[in-house]
Amino acid sequence: MTCCGCSGGCGSSCGGCGSSCCKPVCCCVPVCSCSSCGGCKGGCGSCGGCKGGCGSCGGCKGGCGSCGGCKGGCCQSSCCKPCCCQSSCCKPCCSSGCGSSCCQSSCCKPCCCQSSCCKPCCSSGCGSSCCQSSCCKPCCCQSSCCKPCCCQSSCCKPCCSSGCGSSCCQSSCCKPCCCQSSCCKPCCCQSSCCKPCCCQSSCCKPCCCQSSCCAPVCCQCKI
């Protein structure tokens, strides 16, 4: 049994540890090599012996043993939980390389701004209409990421994409996200006559511009 690399017994008063080791605090543990820490700082007992390159943190802070040594020099403020900024270490703040819109407050879960890391805000590269507040679910503005605020592919629910007629692209007019073919459901060119929702070619079913005159073609009456 050694005392932080110092030869000698491990008595109740640290029994022979030199000034370069942990003299005030007895640091006698089965395996303890404080050379990697540049000396025991704050008492090796608090972290069960210095482990794996604590120098990057400037000594063990809060117990490096929980993460097997500090990594990447991220032992600061309330950034880390155990003692690093990788994998699932961080909670409130993100590592570098994330967009300014994401790496803040309680934005991230693990520690990044990609894949399924972020919750409320989106990563860069999304349209201005999507990457805001509670717009996205995982962290993008494509596929099925966004809920209320985007107009692409199958992202949107309530709003329509551009290029639709003013009578269609509103409120809960569309289902997938367009005003063509069989995209729209409830809205019509006039009252509530159309089923799919547009007044072109084979758009309408039973609706009519007057009574029940239209079948395949909309807004033209059969005589």
From Swiss-Prot:
Please name the InterPro entries in this protein's record: KAP
Reported tissue expression = Expressed during the active phases of the hair cycle in the medulla and the inner root sheath of the forming hair. Also expressed in the upper layers of the epidermis of skin.
KW Metal-binding (keyword) present: no
Offer one Pfam family short name for this entry.
Keratin_B2_2
Which residues lie within the region annotated 14 X 4 AA repeats of C-C-X-P?
A: 21-216
Q: Where are the sequence repeats?
A: 21-24, 27-30, 79-82, 89-92, 107-110, 117-120, 135-138, 145-148, 155-158, 173-176, 183-186, 193-196, 203-206, 213-216
The domain of life is Eukaryota
What does the UniProt function comment say about this protein?
In the hair cortex, hair keratin intermediate filaments are embedded in an interfilamentous matrix, consisting of hair keratin-associated protein (KRTAP), which are essential for the formation of a rigid and resistant hair shaft through their extensive disulfide bond cross-linking with abundant cysteine residues of hair keratins. The matrix proteins include the high-sulfur and high-glycine-tyrosine keratins.
Q: Protein name, please?
A: Keratin-associated protein 5-4
Q: What is the lineage of its organism?
A: Eukaryota, Metazoa, Chordata, Craniata, Vertebrata
Q: Which gene encodes it?
A: Krtap5-4
